Amino acid sequence: MAVVVKLSGRIFEDEELVLKYAEAIKSYGVKIAVVTGGGELARRYISAAKRGGASNTFQDLIGIYASRLNALLLISLLGDAYPKVPTNIEEFLEAWRSHRVVVAGGFQPGQSTATVAALVAEAAGASVLLNAANIDAVYSDDPRKNPKAERLPHLKYDEFERIVRSSSLPGGYELMDVWSISILRRNCITVYIFDGRRPEHIGAILRGENPGTKITC
């Protein structure tokens, strides 16, 4: 079984958490690809570039290189992972044929790492994408502002897309965007969104549990 894990860039702001994810990924006997976000490193550099008048394309490139640096860090911790960070889908496929864990960051300007994760899942023939996010599940509204917001353990893609489009969930773009949803839906790939602070949830999901939100066709 092929599995893709999308790691929020925020995870890389905590050294201990990154180490725990490396151990979690090494411990599971499935074929895994990982896509990393840029996190605080990307935000800080992009902010400086924006103040200096850099174009949106150049700002995107900075974010891409930050995500690739996070990917390289994870590769260094995994030991036997593919040693290079693929920079496009062709390079990913070449790396994937090595039968080792492959870790990617961003691919091109104007494209989120959520979309990269969806493209990687499609190319790898993965049946599942695990999204280690900055929230523990998908909610009907922002639970930090609305204590009556409903936690949604199961969603269909159409329902999830409506939530993302409504922007009722802060960070929705980080969870997924409409491009990534479109790619995942056309391949009927099951998505789990779970608390990125809990690397042990990877094992729980692979055992058939649902610690967050499960999204299906």
From Swiss-Prot:
Ways its activity is controlled: Inhibited by UTP.
Alphabetical UniProt keywords: ATP-binding, Cytoplasm, Kinase, Nucleotide-binding, Pyrimidine biosynthesis, Transferase
Pathway assignment: Pyrimidine metabolism; CTP biosynthesis via de novo pathway; UDP from UMP (UMPK route): step 1/1
Membrane-spanning segments: none
Broad EC category: transferase
Function: Catalyzes the reversible phosphorylation of UMP to UDP.
Lineage per the UniProt record: Archaea, Thermoproteota, Thermoprotei, Thermoproteales, Thermoproteaceae
Source domain of life: Archaea
Subunit structure: Homohexamer.
Annotated localization: Cytoplasm
Gene3D superfamilies in alphabetical order: Acetylglutamate kinase-like (3.40.1160.10)
GO biological process, one term: UDP biosynthetic process
Gene encoding the protein: pyrH
Binding site residues for ATP: K6, L7, S8, G9, R10, G39, R43, N134, Y139, D142
Pfam (any one): AA_kinase
Annotated catalysed reactions: UMP + ATP = UDP + ADP
Protein name: Uridylate kinase
Principal cellular location given in the protein's record: cytoplasm
HAMAP family registered for this protein in UniProt: PyrH_A
EC number: 2.7.4.22
GO terms for MF: ATP binding; UMP kinase activity
Protein family: Belongs to the UMP kinase family.
CC per GO annotation: cytoplasm
Record: residues binding UMP: G38, D60, F107, Q108, P109, G110, Q111, S112, T113
